[in-house]
Design a protein with these regions (language model features):
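Conserved non-catalytic scaffold segment of RNase H-like nuclease domains
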Residues: 2-109, 160
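Active-site flanking residues adjacent to catalytic metal/cofactor-binding acidic residues
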Residues: 7, 129, 167
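Short, glycine/acidic-enriched loop or turn micro-motifs at the edges of active sites
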Residues: 11-13, 133, 171
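Active-site-proximal helix-loop-helix substrate-binding element of RNase H-like nuclease domains
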Residues: 56-58, 62-65, 72, 132-169
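Substrate-recognition/cap helix-loop segment adjacent to the acidic, metal-dependent catalytic center
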Residues: 102-127
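Active-site catalytic microenvironments for nucleophilic, acid-base chemistry
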Residues: 110-114, 137, 153, 178-182
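Short, flexible loop segments at boundaries between secondary-structure elements
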Residues: 122-144, 197-200
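Acidic two-metal-ion nuclease catalytic site recognized across multiple nuclease folds
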Residues: 174-222
C-alpha cells in the first residue's frame, strides 16, 4: 500500500461572457490536500488560495466557502499554486483521492485551458480514487451523497468549516481510511435507523439526534 494524497478543490463560477476566452464553467480558487502514509495516517496538510483570472467570487461562493477577495487578490495563479503543491508532495508517486470525480476533471480541464503542462502532474500523481463512489458502494444505494452527509452517516465528526479545501480534504481522508479499514462498515445508528427500509425518503430524526454518540476524530490543529 503506497501513499495517498487526498485533494479538494474550491471553485468559483465563470460568467458566460468570460467563457468566450476561457472554456470552463468554473475556476479553481483553493487547493486543499491531506497526505496519508502507508498506514493511512494523515501526516501533513496543504492549503493554497489561487487567484482567478476569469472567475467571479460571488456572494454565494463567499458564503459557502468563507473565501473573500482579500484571500485571493495577492494569491498565486494556478501555475504557481501547482508548483507549490508539487513541491509539497513526496518525491515518490502517490495515488490521488477526491470526494468525487469533479476535482480531477476540473483540474485537467483547467490546466488544458490555461496551457499548463500535465507532465509534472502525471509523474507525481498516479491513478485517482473516487471516494464518493466507494461510499455509495458500501451503502448499496446508487445516488450522490454530499461529503457532509457521508461523514454524519459514517460516525465521523471533525473540526473545521465545510467547503474549505483543506478541511474537506482532511475529512475525506478520515472517511477514506474508514472505507478501507472497516470490513463491516459501521454507520451512525441514528442515521441507519432513519434510513431503514419502510421509513421512506424523509429523514425522521433531527441533526442533534444524528450527532449523539459520535466517535469524535482528532480535529485539525489551530
Amino acid at each position: 500500500m503506497g501513499k495517498y494524497v487526498v485533494i479538494d478543490l474550491e471553485m468559483c463560477p465563470v460568467t458566460s461572457e468570460k467563457r468566450r476566452n476561457f472554456h470552463c464553467r468554473h475556476e479553481i480558487i483553493q487547493i486543499g490536500a491531506a497526505l496519508m502514509n502507508e498506514e493511512l495516517e494523515i501526516v501533513n496538510t496543504f492549503s493554497c488560495y489561487v487567484r482567478p483570472a476569469f472567475g467571479k467570487l460571488d456572494p454565494f461562493i463567499q458564503g459557502l466557502t468563507g473565501i473573500c477577495w482579500a484571500d485571493l487578490k495577492d494569491a498565486p495563479c494556478l501555475k504557481e499554486a501547482l508548483q507549490q503543491f508539487f513541491a509539497w508532495l513526496p518525491e515518490e508517486m502517490v495515488t490521488a483521492v477526491a470526494w468525487s470525480g469533479t476535482d480531477e476533471s476540473q483540474l485537467r480541464r483547467e490546466m488544458e485551458c490555461k496551457n499548463l503542462s500535465m507532465e509534472g502532474f502525471s509523474v507525481r500523481v498516479g491513478s485517482w480514487v473516487d471516494c464518493q463512489a466507494m461510499f455509495a458502494g458500501k451503502m448499496r444505494i446508487k445516488r450522490c451523497y454530499s461529503l457532509q452527509e457521508a461523514l454524519i452517516a459514517s460516525d465521523i465528526l471533525s473540526e473545521g468549516r465545510a467547503h474549505n479545501g483543506m478541511v474537506d480534504a482532511y475529512n475525506t481522508a478520515l472517511l477514506f481510511r474508514k472505507l478501507l479499514t472497516e470490513e463491516e462498515f459501521r454507520l451512525n445508528p441514528y442515521y441507519e435507523e432513519a434510513h431503514r427500509p419502510g421509513r421512506g425518503s424523509t429523514l425522521q430524526f433531527s441533526l442533534g439526534d444524528l450527532l449523539k454518540g459520535l466517535d469524535l476524530e482528532p480535529g485539525l490543529s489551530a
